Amino acid sequence: MKDISIDTLKQRAEILRAIRKFFDERDFIEVETAVRISAPAPEEHIDCPPMKNGGFLRASPELQMKKLLALGMERIYQIGPCFREGEKGLRHNPEFTMIEWYRRDEDYRKIMQDMTDLMSRIMPDAEEDKLAKIVQVREAYREFAGWDPWEQWDQDRFDFDMATKIEPAIKQMGGGVFLTDYPLAAASLARARGDVAERWEYYWNGMELANCFTELCDREEQLGRFEKARAARKALNEADYPIDMEFIDSLPLIGSAAGVALGVDRLVMVALAKHDIAAVREVE
């Protein structure tokens, strides 16, 4: 705590109040779901801390929140702690605060508008045309990396070029940038539309803040993606996570939806012009 000032703690609290007010004004319901879960979503390179007596600390409340959508909730948000093993640095901490929000019967374009409006609220001095530049993933790779991931998929090259070429180029653009429409191989939990996944990530001055999907609600396709992710984790000698079949079985009840995960600590960092996560929250 020694790196955090009282003024910063007060400003962080004001930002959290502003976030809640923003969603309350739009008739969202704030929800709470379990922090200790039995079955995380299997994703390569995202490791949830295991608990001694079984289960895991969540990396995201995503699966649990989607179950609420399946029950009939329409607009929900949650602010709370999340955990990822092995992530520590100026922008990372094993424990961090996340906000996720979801809308039934909407797609990623509506969440993009939410994100733009929220940033306008949190960054009131930012020029409007600096809040929401849209960059297509395919065009970004063609221009800044010199190849097309759709023509010849290479996961390692895609990830390497994202970190060394695409994100530095986004930083040079300044302000808010939506990097949108990913290859299907990088769809994660996003719905496909033709040869693209309806997914975007939002950056502010080059720092990734948020990751959004039009949600995949096809039971069999999602089960297949989870099985493929489990196989990839096994090949990398990473921990195996059981599949949450309650989540899988709930997907047809959702119909259609979109949602986003936004890192609160990073949002506070950019709002207060801090360059170290330790300046805005307690860290290990």
Predicted regions: what they are:
Residues M1-D7, F144-A145:
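A short, surface-exposed helix-loop junction/capping segment
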Residues T8-L9, F23:
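Auxiliary tRNA-acceptor-end handling modules of aminoacyl-tRNA synthetases
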Residues Q11-I15:
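Aromatic- and glycine-enriched glycan-recognition loops and surfaces
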Residues L16, R20, D24, M112-M119, ...:
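Hydrophobic face of alpha-helices
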Residues A18-K21, A34-L71, R75-R104, A145-E284:
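A translation/RNA-centric and nucleic-acid-associated enzymatic feature enriched
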Residues E30-E32:
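Short beta-strand elements
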Residues R91-W153:
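A conserved active-site cap/scaffold subdomain adjacent to cofactor or substrate pockets
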